From Swiss-Prot:
GO terms for biological process: chlorophyll biosynthetic process; protoporphyrinogen IX biosynthetic process. The keyword Cytoplasm applies. The keyword Hydrolase does not apply. SUPFAM superfamilies: PLP-dependent transferases. Transmembrane segments: none annotated. Keywords: Chlorophyll biosynthesis, Cytoplasm, Isomerase, Porphyrin biosynthesis, Pyridoxal phosphate. This is Glutamate-1-semialdehyde 2,1-aminomutase. Belongs to the class-III pyridoxal-phosphate-dependent aminotransferase family. HemL subfamily. It comes from Chloroflexus aurantiacus (strain ATCC 29366 / DSM 635 / J-10-fl). PROSITE patterns: AA_TRANSFER_CLASS_3 (PS00600). HAMAP family: HemL_aminotrans_3.
Amino acid sequence: MSVVTERYSRSQADYAAAREVIPGGVNSPVRAFRGVGGIPIFFERGQGAYVWDVDGNRYIDYVLSWGPLLLGHAHPAVVEAITLQAQRGTSFGAPTELETELARLVIELVPSIEQIRFVNSGTEATMSALRLARAATGRRLIVKFNGCYHGHADMLLVQAGSGVATLGLPDSPGVPPSVAAETITIEYNDLDAAAALFANRGAEIAAVIVEPIAANMGFVLPKPGFLSGLRELTQTHGAIFILDEVMTGFRVAAGGAQALWGLDPDLTCLGKVIGGGLPVGAYAGKRQLMQLVAPAGPMYQAGTLSGNPLAMTAGLTTLRTAFGGDAGAFQQAVTRTARLADGLRMLGERYRIPVQVGNVGTMFGCYFLRQEGSQITSYAEAKAYADSQRYARFFWAMADQGIYLAPSQFEAGFLSTAHSDADIDETLAAAEVAFAGLVSSAE
């Protein structure tokens, strides 16, 4: 792992200053770099596929603010749209035409969605969707999957992923046992366990919520039939099927994972990309369900800045640019993501370092494994087989060469339409140096 050197000296000073006034020095736990050790890198600007830290070091960025920046940093069209709207007003607390325009575009892109409600974060989206599911069914139990992260609402911080996985916390202090008791967790990809649960308690279950790709415990793909099997179980037992596409939405395909794999959820949670880099979330779905949301119906949900015009125009511009008349740039990003993933796999084979690399659309993930032949398909396996110490050495070897990856192997990576073939070449060249270093350090 990297030690503090002149390369990161200002980040070290900034971190010390931040810890005096911010708990842990960061405003979201994974940013503290606990998953890789050392100090967090402080950034000051970004452009296209690149970010620069406060020490002036340039990096090819594969975090992209944890996914929202599909077009890369400071895309000219997005910057112009935000600037023009800011000059007109940043928030009105009243309806705008931008909300309707973005709603129509999302409905056009995602086949299952008939109506949508914008909120301010992915956490608000999942929390509201689950409240809606309980209102619609009159039931109380929620089913989620170990290692899947759906935000930090009390009922969802049970065997969660993301920062909770990085920090090794099974759940969070402050969550009342009575709240946690209404969330049942089972292993991701275990359809038999889900079927057994429904056979035993199906009449009590309001909803099943799942990430189509478990990208908050690394990068775990669904087994064939897993997601469609969950859809069938919920239909049979009258529960609501919620697909959390906060991360995969508009990242793996224009219509999300559900369009890619032919799924028809009752409700969908969105975020990240639909805000174009500004705070946003949304829950959406069938008209019959969404008509229960106030003021159309009795289920209350509100927000001072929900649907604010800055986020709406940033999201609208992002989606129009990515999936408008020419979606070639998005397809090129998909191709480059696959090339990066293939290159990492080949390096693992060449240097005899066991890795598990996955990719779909513009998302990817890379586990370093404790032993050859292991395969991670669930949270239990991720905890058992993932070699976090080796990943930490790899992370810093890449950072020292100007490649910024997620500071935890329990987080996914992302590409943007701004990443070039030359960026992939540079990244794989750096990765070869890093893999060679892992071999030499083990000898």
